[in-house]
């Protein structure tokens, strides 16, 4: 029995760590949103404005800025699910992968985006979905392939928002693509 209890403690600790980072980021998402609302200000200027120096800071700050509560809630749920899957299945490389996705999605958006402000965590979300799907298939380990299938089942429809066809002009399809 002690070995079983010890294994349970290890699994609880690993699961706890898989949730800490995602919840910390979600807390920051919501805190920024609440500060923006309480101060009656607009943080859109902390987004990315492609090919302009004024938009470079957005590579770091864009995922924290959301247009409204609907945008924030949609990103929050998806971000939580995908980041927990990332940090639970790839705990040794998850932080590195997360940071690379964060930075590269911002840089790519800065290069390819329309000349307007782009905000939200969609680039990071799409990047995590892409990583979880591809990595699971390429590594050919059953739990990771299962994760790939979960991602496709839950978020396979996201692919249609990577193209400008039929999307509202205020939605950054470039942010999804990057």
Task: Tell me the role of every PLM-derived stretch.
Residues 2-178:
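A detector for small-residue-rich transmembrane helices and their helix-helix packing motifs
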């Amino acid at each position: 029995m002690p070995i079983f209890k010890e294994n349970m403690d290890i699994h609880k600790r690993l699961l706890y760590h898989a949730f800490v980072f995602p919840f910390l980021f979600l807390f920051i998402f919501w805190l920024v949103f609440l500060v923006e609302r309480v101060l009656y200000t607009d943080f859109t200027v902390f987004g990315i404005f492609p090919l302009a120096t004024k938009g470079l800071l957005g590579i770091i700050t864009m995922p924290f800025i959301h247009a409204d509560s609907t945008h924030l809630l949609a990103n929050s749920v998806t971000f939580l699910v995908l980041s927990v899957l990332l940090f639970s299945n790839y705990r040794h490389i998850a932080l590195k992968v997360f940071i690379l996705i964060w930075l590269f999605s911002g840089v790519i958006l800065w290069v390819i985006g329309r000349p307007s402000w782009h905000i939200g965590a969609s680039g990071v979300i799409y990047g995590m979905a892409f990583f979880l799907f591809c990595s699971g298939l390429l590594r050919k380990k059953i739990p990771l392939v299962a994760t790939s299938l979960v991602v496709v089942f839950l978020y396979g429809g996201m692919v249609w928002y990577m193209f400008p066809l039929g999307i509202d002009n205020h939605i950054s399809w470039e942010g999804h693509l990057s």
